[in-house]
Amino acid sequence: MAGESFEWWRRTMQYQTGLGLTADEKARYEKDYAVYNREKQCKSCYEYRDWMLKYSPTVRFMIQQISKLNGNASDGKVLNFDESKIICDECPDWKSGGFHPEIGILLCQNRLKDKWHLEDTLSHELVHYFDNLKWQIDWLNLKQHACSEIRASALSGECRFSREFARLGFSMNFGRGHQDCAKRRAIISVMGNPNCKDKEHATKVVEEVWDSCFYDTRPFEEIYR
């Protein structure tokens, strides 16, 4: 094991300095590094996921609410959430996660910056999961899609003050930062819907459902994070 670690260190130093590095060695290192990095990201993603399932108040609460919606077992107990429906994998574009009603939740291991970014992303997708069970969302219906995106951004914690300030600094609207963030992110998500024409179309749809969806904090009593 120590020998393997030293050899990897040697190859890394050779790659970074370029000393004695042939074109074949460079290509082989980049290929090996991609595999190494993918495995490392995957391991971290599942470790963070499992930690959040145990210790995150938001994630644990959403799991409980989803389990209730899933129905009861024959003995009257609430069915447990199937954690295998939350998977980690690489994503080719800008998103950090996704939800599919038949498959479950995807966490983009190569897009997640840290454990807390994963918490926000998982919480966001769990809101979609909840909405889909409670209201049988038609994800190609722009208004229904927009409503769930507004709720997911508002309730997940991804638009809380500290996150938004880190993104925008003093250019953020301190009075409406949370609302602006939820609206902005919902518009971006709706733009990805195949039935959406462009940003103007997405903005119009989000505005139409904004009040009824932003202030609907179910299953929370209020915006928690």
Swiss-Prot record:
Pfam families: Peptidase_M76
Topology with respect to the bilayer: Peripheral membrane protein
Family: Belongs to the peptidase M76 family.
Superkingdom field: Eukaryota
Top class in the EC scheme: hydrolase
Record function comment: Has a dual role in the assembly of mitochondrial ATPase. Acts as a protease that removes N-terminal residues of mitochondrial ATPase CF(0) subunit 6 at the intermembrane space side. Also involved in the correct assembly of the membrane-embedded ATPase CF(0) particle, probably mediating association of subunit 6 with the subunit 9 ring.
Localization terms from the record: Mitochondrion inner membrane
Catalytic site positions: 125
Keywords associated with the record: Hydrolase, Membrane, Metal-binding, Metalloprotease, Mitochondrion, Mitochondrion inner membrane, Protease
InterPro entries named among the record's database cross-references: Peptidase_M76_ATP23
Known EC number: 3.4.24.-
GO molecular function: metal ion binding; metalloendopeptidase activity
Gene Ontology cellular component list: mitochondrial inner membrane
Binding site for a divalent metal cation: 124, 128
Gene for this chain: ATP23
Record-level GO BP terms: mitochondrial protein processing; mitochondrial proton-transporting ATP synthase complex assembly
Protein name: Mitochondrial inner membrane protease ATP23
Organism this protein belongs to: Candida glabrata (strain ATCC 2001 / BCRC 20586 / JCM 3761 / NBRC 0622 / NRRL Y-65 / CBS 138) (Yeast)
Residues spanning the signal sequence: none
